[in-house]
Swiss-Prot record:
Protein name, UniProt field: Non-structural protein 7b
Entry keyword annotation includes Signal: yes
Taxonomic lineage of the native organism: Viruses, Riboviria, Orthornavirae, Pisuviricota, Pisoniviricetes
InterPro entries: Corona_6B_7B (IPR004945)
Domain of life: Viruses
Database matches in Pfam families: Corona_6B_7B (PF03262)
Signal peptide region: 1-15
Keywords for this protein: Signal
UniProt source species: Canine coronavirus (strain BGF10)
Presence of keyword Signal: yes
Length: 213
């Protein structure tokens, strides 16, 4: 399938002919922004839209943002929707930690098999989140709901978020609401930067951590 890389921003989408849907002025809820039509959506079928910043994707009634199942577990899009009389506003916030674990979604076009693919570039990648460098003991900044364990069998839970600054591998479990029962298991790697003076030293530590797993 041929993918067209498109950064989804209002100026670009408007450049593809999006019409402005201006409703009656309401000081409490001014509702004026570019909206997609079925005709415009047709141009993107089979392609991928990349979302890199907080965006509102306005779709006609009947179109939905969905995600595929995760190993048999249903998955739902984590954003929120605003309904208008002729369209739905889908609000994307790449800082949502769910996007660090699930970043691929699609726009379903009613009963059609055709899709428009969406790729959300998370504000913090999963790799960056789970590889931490330090100089002193620290409180690790992980999303609410992630549990940290000392052992790979996930029996010995780390109390709180405060960790020692030492070359160490922890094990994490994340069971987000929108994965509907599915849990992501991964590893949190901590590097004591005071002891890493070169790239060679870093690679040696990384290799040692892999051997421990």
């Amino acid at each position: 399938m041929k993918f067209l890389i498109i950064v989804l921003c209002l100026s670009l989408v408007n450049g593809y002919g999006i019409k402005r849907n201006v409703q009656e002025h309401d000081l409490k809820d001014p509702h004026e922004h570019p909206t997609m039509t079925w005709e415009i959506l047709e141009r993107f079928v089979g392609n991928t839209l990349y979302i890199t910043t907080p965006q509102v994707l306005s779709l006609p009634l009947g179109a939905e943002v969905r995600c595929d199942d995760i190993e048999g577990f249903s998955c739902s899009w984590p954003g929120y929707k605003d309904y208008a009389h002729d369209h739905i506003d889908f609000h994307f916030n790449p800082s949502n930690p769910f996007y660090s674990f699930v970043d691929t979604f699609y726009v379903s076009l009613g009963d059609r098999v055709d899709k428009i693919y969406l790729r959300v570039i998370s504000a913090t990648s999963r790799e960056k989140m789970l590889n931490v460098g330090c100089h002193t003991s620290f409180s690790v900044n992980l999303p609410i709901g992630i549990q940290i364990y000392h052992d790979k069998d996930m029996k010995l839970l780390v109390e709180g978020r405060h960790l020692e600054c030492a070359h160490r591998v922890y094990f994490v479990k994340y069971c987000p609401y929108h994965a509907h029962g599915y849990c992501f298991d991964d590893k949190l790697k901590v590097y004591d930067l005071k002891r890493i003076k070169s790239r060679k030293a870093f690679e040696k530590v990384s290799q040692h951590q892999k051997s421990e797993l």
